[in-house]
Regions:
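Sec-dependent N-terminal signal peptides of Gram-positive bacterial secreted proteins and lipoproteins
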Residues: 1-27
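Generic detector of isolated residues embedded in canonical secondary-structure elements
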Residues: 15, 26, 80-81, 167
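Short, polar/proline-rich extracytoplasmic segments that appear immediately after membrane translocation
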Residues: 25-80, 88, 174-198
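Surface-exposed interaction patch
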Residues: 28-31, 37, 66-143
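Short, exposed beta-strand/loop patches in secreted or surface proteins that constitute
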Residues: 47-49, 84, 154-159
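Generic short beta-strand segments
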Residues: 62-64, 97-102, 165-173
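Beta-strand secondary-structure signal
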Residues: 81-83, 93-95, 165-169, 183-187
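Low-complexity, intrinsically disordered segments enriched in Ser/Thr together with acidic residues
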Residues: 147-178
Length: 198
């Protein structure tokens, strides 16, 4: 019986030592301690830090597109599908904050900020994909890029870890120079949102 009790005491002591060391390992970041007697009480101040939410969205850095009046559709742009993926665990919105436009190679051409064009105007915008894998034919719900000015325009809302797509859309007047290039460079901003994607 004595041997059995001695064995239990050793086993209990070993278990307490293991639990003490494992507790100490987890509590290594505690800066100060104090004794609380059995039957007594004491306060422990606990300070929590809320870490910033990491927002990441993957999208291309270069998108080539063609625009031509020879297309019979309202949308005169042939654009690749612009895949956008929210890699965050929270919903995000993708906004255009500013668009740099250089149409200096297009002689006698001006930019339209609204999508309505005269004979010498061009307009470019972004449109959320409505039919999977299908380029838009019309310009309804297009978000028009305003040339060389601040713009706070939402183009896409994505739920957590959701993928979505945009297309470049646009139109041009019949007198806009052909066989010339121009640059449109929108600056995208990703923000946390309380809204949800459709």
């Amino acid at each position: 019986m004595k041997k059995k009790n001695m064995f239990l005491q050793l086993a209990l002591t070993a278990a307490l030592l293991v639990s003490t060391f494992s507790t100490t390992a987890y509590a290594s970041d505690v800066t100060s301690t104090r004794d609380i007697p059995v039957g007594g009480s004491g306060q422990v101040e606990m300070v929590g830090t809320i870490e910033p939410t990491i927002l990441t969205v993957t999208m291309p850095t270069f998108v080539p597109f063609n625009i031509s009046n020879s297309l019979s559709t309202q949308n005169k742009v042939i654009s690749p599908r612009i895949n956008v993926k929210n890699n965050s665990n929270v919903p995000v919105q993708v906004d255009v904050a500013y668009t740099s436009v250089d149409i200096s190679k297009l002689k006698n051409t001006t930019w339209s900020n609204t999508g309505a064009v005269t004979a010498n105007q061009i307009a470019i915008g972004l449109k959320q994909e409505e039919t999977p894998g299908e380029m838009p034919k019309d310009l309804s719900n297009a978000r028009w890029l305003e040339a060389n000015k601040q713009q706070d325009m939402n183009v896409l809302i994505l739920n957590s870890n959701q993928e979505g797509a945009l297309y470049v859309v646009g139109t041009l007047g019949q007198d806009v120079s052909e066989s010339a290039t121009f640059n449109v460079t929108p600056t995208f901003v990703v923000r946390k949102t309380s809204g949800t994607a459709n």
